Amino acid sequence: MAEVTQLKRYDARPINWGKWFLIGIGMLVSAFILLVPMIYIFVQAFSKGLMPVLQNLADPDMLHAIWLTVMIALIAVPVNLVFGILLAWLVTRFNFPGRQLLLTLLDIPFAVSPVVAGLVYLLFYGSNGPLGGWLDEHNLQIMFSWPGMVLVTIFVTCPFVVRELVPVMLSQGSQEDEAAILLGASGWQMFRRVTLPNIRWALLYGVVLTNARAIGEFGAVSVVSGSIRGETLSLPLQIELLEQDYNTVGSFTAAALLTLMAIITLFLKSMLQWRLENQEKRAQQEEHHEH
């Protein structure tokens, strides 16, 4: 009888229309801001059928833009992977003067406009910059070439791995690392067998975010590339060029390809985030059982 009374009381609760209204508004706004534009990109790309899409994808300039985008990511991501691990290890395992300043400096790529970052690199490595004369004497071209595009991409993507690793490494502490050293493990053995398994999901999550930013970077890359057709056009820059040439199908084809890359990256990010959250829950449960 008590259960029936409790059920009736539960059923008698008024519906929270305000909550559902806010949920509906949030879903609607998200759909129009995020989902509808992505769908529109694919609709426009295939508006004249499959053949124009295939023809645009087979265009030499398009293929070069795809290759250049992938190459930049393949260089920038590993560099930031190593840099992120070393810097995260430094700020989480050692106390030193300027540690907080170093963590603050890592946020500069988030705070500075990518266009400003590209301009700084252009002025520094350009012909009239501090290193420009030396580079010209040795026939080394950084600006208006792919090395400059790689440099600015490394700059704008450098915080992601570090920012993912630091909280995880701080929460885990250094007890396991110290125990491994006491048991006779070398530095590399300690990292490979103790540290890396504990940070692997956060590390992969940071790599996915770095890759997403690397393949989609436009502002900084556009400043230092010179936008030379068939030479220094990454996929985002190729989209702009095709749009300026009134090649609507071509620009939407490139945009659809870039969007597809972003969707795959987002899917990987979500999977890694899910794994990371589950790992943290299991660790908390194990710690609770121990106590």
Curated annotation (Swiss-Prot):
Membrane-crossing residue ranges in chain numbering: 23-43, 70-90, 105-125, 142-162, 201-221, 248-268
Gene name, Swiss-Prot/TrEMBL: cysW
Principal place of residence: membrane
Organism name: Escherichia coli (strain K12)
Taxonomic lineage: Bacteria, Pseudomonadati, Pseudomonadota, Gammaproteobacteria, Enterobacterales
Compartment list: Cell inner membrane
Transferase in keyword set: no
GO BP: sulfate transmembrane transport; thiosulfate transport
Xref: Gene3D superfamilies: MetI-like
Name this polypeptide is given: Sulfate transport system permease protein CysW
